[in-house]
From Swiss-Prot:
GO terms for biological process: L-leucine biosynthetic process. This is 3-isopropylmalate dehydrogenase. Residues 352-371 are annotated as: Disordered. Keywords: Amino-acid biosynthesis, Branched-chain amino acid biosynthesis, Cytoplasm, Leucine biosynthesis, Magnesium, Manganese, Metal-binding, NAD, Oxidoreductase. Catalyzes the oxidation of 3-carboxy-2-hydroxy-4-methylpentanoate (3-isopropylmalate) to 3-carboxy-4-methyl-2-oxopentanoate. The product decarboxylates to 4-methyl-2 oxopentanoate. The record marks 155, 204 as: Important for catalysis. Pathway: Amino-acid biosynthesis; L-leucine biosynthesis; L-leucine from 3-methyl-2-oxobutanoate: step 3/4. Signal peptide: none annotated. Substrate binds at residues 111, 121, 148, 237. One of its GO terms (cellular component) is cytosol. It is an enzyme of class 1 (oxidoreductase).
Length: 405
């Protein structure tokens, strides 16, 4: 029996929990189980604070997100969000009786006010056995990350509602600095792999002036600053066709505008077999120190049509794994959580959407144990590799602690 290791508190991280609406609080609760397990194993303290957003905030606080909640989010190390909104006909009523406030306004305000400019959505098969659940053929081997610009473009441009004239308009606007920073985010992510991943930039440069600026700026940034990276430009309509016909052809990092990213990421969401498997991260800076401020949430909605304990928590748990890696400087823990999720999927410990019979909480209950197991195996492997590395260094006359290139 191994001697018990007494852990001491080495750090404290504040995480704001925005459960949101319908299934949102349920899936957040399962991610918290995993995060508490990580904290216990690592000696890190996670301080959680629950706040309201979306319809829940409208009904209790009169607006989809309050200034007080925004201020608390700004001061946190990271944010986890469940889901916002409900069915199209859901009516949200403020304490003073108004029904004209929409839950989604809270999420848009959160993204804009906290400058969460880069939305990352990984898309891959967690297990080959899930391929048959996808409505698309040829999904095996698919592995890409969509990087969507999140605080610019048509969603935040000048808007003119129909005033009775029968005319309405929305304006798509992008500036060079906005495009530069999202291009650098894509390049950074591509360079985290060996060899570096190709970058795909999606636009509509044959029609839109904003897309021509987008293409010109992305080309310049990657050519001047990241010449080692492969850059491919693709028109958005052509890219949409490729993702249906042969999604693995676009493996790598996909970068695109706010509206195009919104559409293409929803299209890509059918590839893994269920929306309940897709995590996301929205970052305010490059995660070059693994401490970027971010908002982490599943790609699925609030599922108002499903009953309690039926929603797949994996997307939210994988979002927590992304948070560990990008915002909390705990990459090994994030890797262990991802490995545990894949093991659970392989073992069939899943919700009904991907062929299992487990409830939301049953999936969440099992993952902390699997995460600890994956973490121990990873540490053991790294110790073996480190030992071999030191032996090799001694044989070739290098100091055991020196770096090699």
């Amino acid at each position: 029996m191994e001697p018990e290791t007494k852990k001491t508190k080495t750090d404290s991280k504040k995480i704001v929990l925005l459960g949101g609406d319908f299934c949102g609080p349920e899936v957040i609760a399962e991610a918290v189980k995993v995060l508490k397990s990580v904290a216990e194993a690592s000696g890190t303290e996670f301080v959680f604070e629950d706040r309201l957003i979306g319809g829940a905030a409208i009904e209790k606080e009169g607006e989809p997100i309050t200034d007080a909640t925004l201020d608390i989010c700004r001061k946190a190390d990271s944010i986890m969000l469940g889901a916002v909104g409900g069915a199209a006909n859901t009516v949200w009523t403020t304490p003073d009786g108004r029904t004209d406030v929409r839950p989604e306004q809270g999420l848009l305000k959160l993204r804009k006010d906290l400058n969460l400019y880069a939305n990352l959505r990984p898309c891959q098969l967690l297990s080959p056995k899930l391929a048959d659940l996808s409505p698309i053929r040829n999904v095996e081997g698919t592995d890409f990350i969509i990087v969507r610009e999140l605080v610019g473009g048509i969603y935040f441009g000048e808007r003119k509602e129909d005033d009775g004239s029968g005319v309405a308009s929305d304006t798509e606007t992008y500036s060079v600095p906005e495009v530069e920073r999202i291009a650098r985010m894509a390049a950074f992510l591509a360079l985290q792999h060996n060899p570096p991943l190709p970058v795909w930039s999606l636009d509509k440069a044959n029609v839109l002036a904003s897309s021509r600026l987008w293409r010109k700026t992305v080309t310049r940034v990657l050519k001047d600053e990241f010449p080692q990276l492969e850059l491919n430009h693709q028109l958005i309509d052509s890219a949409a066709m490729i993702l249906i016909k042969q999604p693995s052809k676009m493996n790598g990092i996909i970068i695109t505008t706010n509206m195009f990213g919104d559409i293409i990421s929803d299209e890509a969401s059918v590839i893994p077999g269920s929306l309940g498997l897709l995590p996301s991260a929205s970052l305010a800076s490059l995660p070059d120190t693994n401490e970027a401020f971010g908002l982490y949430e599943p790609c699925h909605g609030s599922a108002p049509d499903l009953g309690k304990q039926k929603v797949n928590p994996i997307a939210t748990i994988l979002s927590a794994a992304m948070m560990l890696k990008f915002s909390l400087n705990m990459k090994p823990a994030g890797d262990a959580v991802e490995a545990a999720v894949k093991e659970s999927v392989e073992a069939g410990i899943t919700t009904a959407d991907i062929g299992g019979s487990s409830s939301t909480s049953e999936v969440g209950d099992l993952l902390p144990t699997r995460s600890r197991s994956c973490s121990r195996r990873s540490k053991s492997f790294l110790r073996r590799i480190d030992g071999r590395s030191k032996l090799t260094r001694l044989r070739v006359g290098l100091p055991a602690g020196s770096a090699s290139v």
